[in-house]
Every structure is written in structure tokens, then in C-alpha cells.
């Protein structure tokens, strides 16, 4: 991934870091990104249907959330922002001005499915099992739960409408985390003499 084109590297970092849906990442706007603090606002999604083409719609839960990026993701996003500005300058009058962070070389919005195609090609090129963008969402959720992030915060970070949704989807990871908690509590007695 380190040698991947910066646009795709940044998209992948954000998918891994935030656990956002691919449409939410594709719908991220520069006006909702603070490159100083690393705070982003997820408040829409870029979607596609044959009848409408590419269009902006609400998030799945019709809500918004603020998220703080990891320093590594922020650094890669800043690299992409420089490349974005270079592309804008190179294209001049041909640049299609759109508000989105992730665009094609001419400034037009990326198709929401393009990340799936890119990751499929990346997997084939590097002879690794195919990774669907939604797998990063599951990884983010599992990582938060395994590291003790409470279910309400995990649900909020993922943009789930209810912690119950999160609990139902990640019941196995929650069971593992609870077993780990029991082991930690048992350790209190083991260390007493």
C-alpha cells in the first residue's frame, strides 16, 4: 500500500481508520475536513444508480458524525491534498470543480464503486486475497471492541443508528472482549497473596 497512488492510498487509510462506508468516504468534502486538527465531518454519501448516475445522498442513517483521524491517516490525506492541488493546476479550465475530497484527475467525482475495483486490482497485482472495502469497516469495529471501546462509542463511530445494531453485528467480538475482561478481573485475585 505504501507504493500505491496517493489518491487510493488516502482512501484506503481513511476506510481503515474510520470504519466509514465507501460512499461516505467518497462523499467527504474538503469543507468538512480540518487538516490542522484532523477532524472530519461525515454527513453525506456519494451514491450511484443507473437512473440517477452519481449523486449525493444522506448517510445510511441520515445522520452526521465528527471523527478524529489518526496522525498517519491525516499525513496521507495531506499528501493527497497537495496532489489534488497539482491536478487542479495542471487541468486549468478543464478542471471540473466539485466539493469532494476524492475526485478523478479532472476534478469530477469518483464513482462510488471505483474503490472496490481498485482494491480488487490491487489484490490481484499483489497476489493477496481480495479485500472488499466493507471489510475495513468490520475490522475497525472489531478493533475498537477488542480494545475496550464501549458499544455506544463504537456504534457512534460507525454511524449505526443504535448500539443494538452494533451489538447484534459484532456479538462474537463482544463475547471475546467480555471473556478478556473476566480474565483481567480474575487476575486481581491471582496477584493477591
List the predicted regions and their residue ranges.
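General beta-strand recognition
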Residues: 39-41
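Basic, Lys/Arg- and aromatic-enriched nucleic-acid-binding interface segment
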Residues: 1-28, 35-36, 47, 63-64, ...
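A short, basic/aromatic helix-end/turn motif that makes direct DNA contacts
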Residues: 27-33, 155-161, 171
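Catalytic-site neighborhood detector that most strongly recognizes the C-terminal catalytic loop/helix
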Residues: 46, 158-183
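C-terminal secondary-structure termini that scaffold catalytic or DNA-interacting sites
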Residues: 37, 46, 50-73, 79, ...
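Short, basic (Lys/Arg/His-rich) helix/loop patches that form interaction surfaces
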Residues: 1-9, 18, 67, 83-93, ...
Amino acid at each position: 500500500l505504501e507504493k500505491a497512488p496517493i489518491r487510493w492510498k488516502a482512501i484506503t487509510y481513511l476506510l481503515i481508520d474510520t470504519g466509514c462506508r465507501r460512499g461516505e468516504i467518497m462523499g467527504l468534502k474538503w469543507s468538512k475536513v480540518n487538516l490542522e486538527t484532523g477532524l472530519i465531518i461525515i454527513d453525506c454519501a456519494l451514491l450511484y444508480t443507473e437512473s440517477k448516475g452519481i449523486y449525493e445522498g444522506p448517510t445510511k442513517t441520515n445522520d452526521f458524525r465528527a471523527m478524529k483521524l489518526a496522525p498517519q491517516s491525516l499525513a496521507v490525506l495531506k499528501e493527497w491534498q497537495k496532489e489534488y492541488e497539482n491536478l487542479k493546476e495542471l487541468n486549468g479550465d478543464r478542471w471540473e470543480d466539485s466539493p469532494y475530497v476524492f475526485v478523478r484527475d479532472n476534478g469530477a467525482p469518483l464513482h462510488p464503486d471505483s474503490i472496490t475495483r481498485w482494491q480488487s486490482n490491487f489484490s490481484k497485482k499483489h497476489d493477496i486475497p481480495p479485500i472488499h472495502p466493507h471489510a475495513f469497516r468490520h475490522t475497525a469495529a472489531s478493533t475498537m471492541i477488542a480494545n475496550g471501546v464501549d458499544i455506544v462509542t463504537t456504534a457512534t463511530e460507525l454511524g449505526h443508528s443504535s448500539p443494538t445494531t452494533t451489538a447484534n453485528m459484532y456479538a462474537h467480538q463482544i463475547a471475546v472482549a467480555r471473556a478478556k475482561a473476566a480474565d483481567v478481573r480474575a487476575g486481581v485475585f491471582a496477584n493477591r497473596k
